[in-house]
Amino acid sequence: MFNFDNTLGYEPPLDVHNLTDEQTAISIENLNLFYGQAQALHDISMRIPKGRVTAFIGPSGCGKSTLLRCINRMNDLVEGCKVTGKVRLHGKNVYHPNVDVATLRRRVGMVFQRPNPFPKSIYENVVYGLRLQGVKNSRTLDDAVERSLRSAALWDEVKDRLHENAFGLSGGQQQRLVIARAVAIEPEVLLLDEPTSALDPISTLTIEELINELKTQYTVVIVTHNMQQAARVSDHTAFIHMGKLIEYSDADSIFTSPMKKQTEDYITGRYG
């Protein structure tokens, strides 16, 4: 069926359909999303476990990035977007009227397809979010820079050039810098929207190895069009098609013995 070889680290899978509240980082309940009159997500319910990597896979335009962006309400920025249902982060509905969206996005970091460092130094990129929070102590900022760059496997490469422009880094280094910027504010969850789609194979492998390290500190949710990548990095995988959650299980089951024919057809290349 599929050569499942998660060489980047393996933990016994959880039963994602019977997670306890303690095991759950994100609970999505009867989620529907509309862009104007067009419905993009249809009644999605799932629980995403803490401290694991969960991958969303599916054909282009299937709704996987839309679903990802519901977790930190990035879809709020799209005119005409309407959401029904609930997305709970550690038990609290992020769509509750009293939720401060800026605070939510500090708790849920996000990395996009293309590296997007700011036109600032490497140092200032990392501390950007901390400065917005009012952190001014130099020692605190210095410590955060080293901690975050180490977490992003970038410290040894840039420790002697922290005050150089971030645009001088390679594409792979820039993406790791963006990850360092995201983790500097110590989020609970990291959302990765096709984070290696613009990178070369060597940089892609570095990011994949980094993802395996990041899950020791954060809950990671990744959207990827690359099924081999999903098999390598994810503990659990959700297959989405036409805005519907078709199948969700541990990655090994999805890629070697899927329960749904739609899933099997997709991962064997019959469509998508």
From Swiss-Prot:
Membrane topology: Peripheral membrane protein
InterPro entries: AAA+_ATPase, ABC_transporter-like_ATP-bd, ABC_transporter-like_CS, P-loop_NTPase, PstB-like
GO cellular component assignments: plasma membrane
Highest taxon above the source species: Bacteria
Cysteines joined through disulfide linkages: none
SUPFAM superfamilies registered for this protein in UniProt: P-loop containing nucleoside triphosphate hydrolases (SSF52540)
Binding site residues for ATP: 58-65
Reaction it catalyzes: phosphate(out) + ATP + H2O = ADP + 2 phosphate(in) + H(+)
Family annotation (Pfam families): ABC_tran
Functional note: Part of the ABC transporter complex PstSACB involved in phosphate import. Responsible for energy coupling to the transport system.
Protein name: Phosphate import ATP-binding protein PstB 1
